[in-house]
Regions:
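Short amphipathic alpha-helix with an adjacent loop that forms part of the alpha/beta core around
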Residues: 4-12
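Glycine-rich phosphate-binding loop of ATP-grasp-fold ATP-dependent ligases
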Residues: 16-47, 73
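A short linear hydrophobic-aromatic micro-motif
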Residues: 17-18, 62-64, 160-162
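Short, well-ordered beta-to-alpha junction loops that form the rim of enzyme active sites
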Residues: 22, 67-68, 165
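Feature marks short, surface-exposed loop/turn motifs that line or immediately flank catalytic pockets
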Residues: 25, 97-101, 169, 183-185
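A short small-residue
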Residues: 27-29, 120-133, 193
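Phosphate-binding site of ATP-dependent enzymes
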Residues: 39-128, 139, 146, 173-175
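ATP-dependent carboxylate activation and anion-phosphoryl transfer catalytic cores
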Residues: 85, 129, 134-225
Length: 225
C-alpha cells in the first residue's frame, strides 16, 4: 500500500479504529491486532492483511477502517424483504456478553478465539466461555430492532440476514457494525448466534427455515404475477 492512503484516518475517525476485510465470513481476517491506536500500527496491520492468512487473500475485496465502538454488542435476525415491511419478521435481539477478563478492545469476535485456534490470542481463564448470550434490556429492544431494519432496508435486503449492532458506552448511541448476508444458520449456539436468538424468541429452527422458504416463495410469486 501507499502510506498516503491512510493519511487523515485518525483525524476523521478518532482512536482506536478497527481495520478489517470488506468481505469476509466467520471473523476471517479479524483479530485483536486489528484494533489500532495510531498510523504506524494501522499500516503494519494493513501490510499483514495483504500478506493473507493460510492461503486466504484477506484483501481481495478491499479493506475498511471504522471507529472501534466500546460498549455492549447486540445481534438481530431478520427474515423477509426490505420492500415488504409488513410481512417481515424482526426477531428479538440478543446481547453478546464477552468474558469479563477481556479488556474492552478485545471484546469482539476475533477469529483466533471464536474458532479456538489460539495461535495469537489466549483462551479464557479457567476454561471460561469466550462469550454468552442474554436478552438485552427491554427498554433497548425497539431501538435495536429499528436500526437493524433501517440498515437492512438501506442494503435492499431480501431473504434473511443478521445485523450486528453496538452501543457506545459513553454516548449510548447505537451503531450498525455490519449486515451479514446469508449468515450461518444453526440452532446450536456454539456455532451461530441464531440458536440464541431462536431460544429467546421461543422459536424452533424448523419454524425459522419455514419462514425463509415461505418468503422465497412469496417473492417468486410476486415476480411472476
Amino acid at each position: 500500500i501507499k502510506e498516503q492512503y491512510t493519511n487523515g484516518i485518525f483525524d476523521r475517525l478518532g482512536a482506536p479504529i478497527i481495520v478489517k476485510p470488506s468481505v469476509s465470513g466467520g471473523s476471517m481476517g479479524v483479530g485483536i491486532k486489528n484494533v489500532v491506536e495510531n498510523k504506524a500500527e494501522l499500516n503494519e496491520q494493513i501490510y499483514k492483511m495483504f500478506d493473507g492468512y493460510r492461503g486466504w487473500n484477506l484483501a481481495a475485496d478491499g479493506l475498511i477502517a471504522e471507529s472501534f465502538i466500546t460498549g455492549p454488542e447486540y445481534t438481530v435476525l431478520i427474515v423477509g424483504s426490505y420492500d415488504k415491511p409488513g410481512l417481515a419478521k424482526i426477531y428479538t435481539p440478543v446481547e453478546r456478553i464477552f468474558h469479563p477478563s477481556l479488556p474492552d478492545k478485545e471484546k469482539f469476535l476475533s477469529f483466533d478465539r471464536l474458532w479456538e485456534i489460539y495461535e495469537d490470542e489466549d483462551p479464557m481463564p479457567n476454561e471460561g466461555n469466550f462469550y454468552e448470550y442474554e436478552t438485552p434490556d427491554a427498554a433497548l429492544i425497539d431501538a435495536i430492532q429499528k436500526i437493524s431494519w433501517d440498515a437492512y432496508v438501506a442494503c435492499k435486503g431480501k431473504g434473511y440476514t443478521r445485523v450486528d449492532v453496538r452501543m457506545d458506552s459513553a454516548t449510548k448511541k447505537l451503531y450498525v457494525l455490519e449486515v451479514n448476508a446469508q449468515c450461518g444458520l444453526s440452532e446450536d449456539e456454539n456455532y451461530t448466534s441464531i440458536g440464541a436468538i431462536l431460544r429467546v424468541s421461543n422459536k424452533t429452527f424448523a419454524e425459522l427455515v419455514i419462514e425463509i422458504i415461505n418468503d422465497a416463495f412469496l417473492r417468486t410469486r410476486l415476480a411472476t404475477d
